[in-house]
Amino acid sequence: MVVNMTKDKFYKIVLYLKDLINGTKFEGKTYVVGGAVRDLYMDKEIKDIDIVVELPSGGIEFANWMEENGHTHGNVVTYPTYGTAMFHLKEYPEVEIECVQTRKEQYKDKNSRNPETEYGTLYEDAMRRDLSINSLFLNISTNQIVDCCGGLNDIKNHVIRVTSTPEIVYEEDGLRILRCVRFFSRFHAENKDWHIDENTLKGMRDKVDRLSIITKERIADELNKMLMCDDPVCAMRLLVDIGAMRYVIPELCNLVGLEQNKYHSDDAWGHTLNVLNLVAKRPFYGAAELEVRMAALLHDIGKPHVKSVDDKGRVHFYGHELAGADIVEIILRRLKYSNDFINEVKFLVENHMRTKQWGDTCEHMKDKTLRKLQYQCGYARFFELLTLIDADNKSHAIDHCLPNQVYMINKFTNRMVDDNTDMFDYKLPINGDDVMFIKGIKPGRDVKDCLEYAMKLAYNNPKITKTELLKHIKGYDILPSLK
């Protein structure tokens, strides 16, 4: 698969394939289909090439023919159950082609989104797809676009519309509801004229319960793509609007209309969307962008569980970040995310309030406190957390938004890095063996207590030497309660 393939390269590949199949049974029967044709027509870069062959078993036969005639790079991989095959082109080894026969589908089991498939016509293949804009075919031999469902007109008019009757489309496969949300959000971010066809939107609402049979992994996959689009807020709003959020992350529904305190100008859901919007708009240079966006979406998920109102009628959410971290784990495990992903998002949510008391210009921050955060985060995670904190700060009411805080944290951090007093990669120069030797104690809680004391000394002075630390440890009185 090629990411961001230029139109010029795409046409070179199409012409290459055209010359190969000229005079064979595949001539006039082989089409590029789906997103590549849509993006070609919309003058966008193309991400992958999917091919359909309008012949029985055409996909596998075409792939095998390519291999037998020396046109593939590496081996062809076939999936006979689904009639599909995958291979890389010899002339363009970085390009992966997925090919399949044109198919028609029957959904006989209402509790499954896996249809029975068999060979079908080009029109039947188009009608089995979800959206008209994804149901376009480019004939490789003639270079003509075949449009069975009005997709070209829908692109011109910026319309997201299903290929046939919405109720049938979504009854057959509820995942199409989430795909529709994703495509709308993606294109609406680029051009606000994009909209969902009225009947298509009604069908999404009417058949939203079909999401109940979709596997959590597929839901998570669509959620990831929504979060990583240019306007994830559009997708999240639409999920709530059509009732789909209760099948994706139902806990988020509890934020809608949740009254907040004077520090906020929106309800908890509006605030969450503002934070997500700011995170999505910010340039990101790390590897954990999805984790940060997920943390933005879930950072206040604990608020409904800890809400309290004092005797003056003021609303409080004490400890919501701690409650939220526990709920984050429940949500992400349910959606089958990896342990590493869960731990990253949990950490960000649990610590997003960490700097609130430092003040707008960090006037209440101590160097040792900043170093402790650096040490506990590590370099990459530190700046991921600051991204979330900055978005959260700036989404508060104007008088409480701490607009300069993260800028000042970065300024102090840069100073520490310059004079080698930061603690991103700090390693304590003593260990448990050193402590046991100098104190004459055995392994246990006392050793841990001494090492924690040593870390406190290091937070104050990261250049402290092993000799100095051991001198302090030798004179350190271990509390009796810790023995």
Where are these regions (language model features)?
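Catalytic cores of the polymerase beta-like nucleotidyltransferase superfamily
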Residues: 1-483
